Amino acid sequence: MNKMQGKKKKKEEEEEEERIIPPELWKLIIEQYKRQLAKTDVMKVSETVKLHEEKIKEKVPTDHIIHAQKPNAWVEETKKSGGCLLV
């Protein structure tokens, strides 16, 4: 069995020696890895932004936001006359 294992190891070593990766392929692999890292960074940032938005909504409910108001009679009159409203 030891002889068989020795032969297998030699074959594996020979296969590893044959696997020479050209520089172009290395550049491609590195570029893809950098892109993947950039995507994960963007995902992390977007997740933290969502978490911050949720916490803000929890602290400050949006019920108090001022909605469209009814028109004020005095303001409407001054707009028609073109003059200034003096108080």
Curated annotation (Swiss-Prot):
The N-terminus is blocked. Residues 85-87 form a propeptide. It is found in: Cell membrane. Disulfide bonds: none annotated. Its main location: membrane. Keywords: Cell membrane, Lipoprotein, Membrane, Methylation, Prenylation, Sensory transduction, Transducer, Vision. GO terms for cellular component: plasma membrane. A lipid is attached at residue 84 (S-geranylgeranyl cysteine). It is a lipid-anchor. GO terms for biological process: signal transduction; visual perception. The modification Cysteine methyl ester is found at residue 84. Belongs to the G protein gamma family. G proteins are composed of 3 units, alpha, beta and gamma. Guanine nucleotide-binding proteins (G proteins) are involved as a modulator or transducer in various transmembrane signaling systems. This major G-protein of the squid photoreceptor is involved in visual transduction. The beta and gamma chains are required for the GTPase activity, for replacement of GDP by GTP, and for G protein-effector interaction. This is Guanine nucleotide-binding protein subunit gamma. It comes from Loligo forbesii (Veined squid).
